[in-house]
Each structure stands twice: as C-alpha cells, then as structure tokens.
Amino acid sequence: MDYTVLDNSALFSGIPTKELCNDLNTVPHHIQRYDKGETIFHLMENASRIGIVLEGNVQAQKPFPNGSQINVSVRKAGELIGAAAAFSRSQKYPCDVVALESATIMFFLREDILLLLQKDLRIMKNFISELATASFMLQQRLELLSYNGIAQKAAFYLLIQARQSGKNVIKIPGSVSNWAMIMNVSRSSLHRELKKLEADGLIAYAPPVIEIHDFDALQNVLSK
C-alpha cells in the first residue's frame, strides 16, 4: 500500500512516511472498501475494531425506535472511527457508521492499535489528542442540536467556528447540503434561513464561504 495517503492523518502527524511504514508493517491491519450507503459499524455491535478513513466520507448516525435519526458526525479521509467506543467500558458502538460515498477504511483490532501506540510515543500522543478532540466536538454537537430553530443552529455553528479560527469568514463544511446534514435539517430550509440572516445584515452568504458582519446580532439569534 502507498502509505503517503496517511500523511494528512492527525493520528500520524509528525511521523515521516518511512518510519510510519515500518511501524505499520509490524502491526496487523487490513483494508476494506465500502459502497455508498453500506454500514461499517452497527449500533451496539461489539467495538473490537478501530478504523482510519483512507478515502471517502462516512457518517455516524443515531437511529431511534420511532424511525427518526440524528446525524452525529461526519468523518473524512485521515480521521478515526470507532476509537472511543473500542476503549469505552461498554465496548459497544453507540451509533451506526455508514459510508456517504464509496469509502476505504484501514482497520486495526483493539489489541493491535495498542501495540502500535506502544511502538511510537508520538502516535500515542496523537491518539490521546484525537480522543480528546472528539469528546470536545461531541459536546459542541450536543449543544448545537439543543437549539430548535434552524437559524439558531446556523448562528451557533458560525460563532463557534469564528471563535476557534479567529476569523469572520467561515468556510462551509463541504457544501450547503453537507452542512444541512450535519445539523440534521433540510438543505432548502437551511438555505432559506441563511438568506434571511443575510437580508437582515448579519452575514454575507456566498458559498462556499459565509462572512459574519454582525457578531452581536448573530449572538442574539441564539436567545430568540
């Protein structure tokens, strides 16, 4: 395999390709392809595997008995899937993970990822950082989903991104359709609310970016 595809993975940040290749060649793993819509991990399945997305985008989805579903997160190439579940007390996947398009995943068994972490302290530090980041992002995700209005969800997302980046120009995550999916709303409804925010002078809506014009007014949207 061409391991250069992992150069952009946060898990292997700071590790030269040659060293990474040597590490991976001594630890069992396998690579599997999935078609669009195919399930990678099933809800409450034994979390014995950890994956790294090599190609494509995958989504964690939380289904409910009444037929509704929450789109929890999207993972793209270079990102981990299943890591927190594999090392949790329950060792069960809390969501379905589904391929949004053709996807390729590198899998490690839980015991084998531990071997990899022991081999290279840099990978261990990166792994801990990834778990902490995922936990922080989940907290933000839960807060976003706590808002009922679409304008509130959009305002919260834009303000969080602006605070983290220190910029007032925010890049839309992938596309408006993808952004809508992340926020669990329809594309048309999100587009309509963004146009309203633009008409009110709060933002400039010009996909693939949005420029925030009035931070205070956008903050006030959250309390409506």
Q: Residue ranges of each PLM-predicted region?
A:
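Cyclic nucleotide-binding regulatory module and flanking cytosolic helices
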Residues: 1-36, 81, 85-88
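Short phosphate-coordinating micro-motif centered on Lys-Gly-acidic
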Residues: 39-45
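Phosphate-/nucleic-acid-contacting segments
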Residues: 161-224
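A short beta-strand-loop-beta hairpin characteristic of the jelly-roll/cupin
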Residues: 58-71
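Short, small/polar residue-rich loop motifs at catalytic or cofactor-binding pockets
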Residues: 26-27, 45-47
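Glycine- and acidic-residue-biased ligand/ion/polar-headgroup-sensing regions
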Residues: 37, 48-61, 77-78
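Cyclic-nucleotide recognition modules
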Residues: 71-129
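Polybasic "coupling" helices that flank or enter modular domains
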Residues: 100-101, 118-184
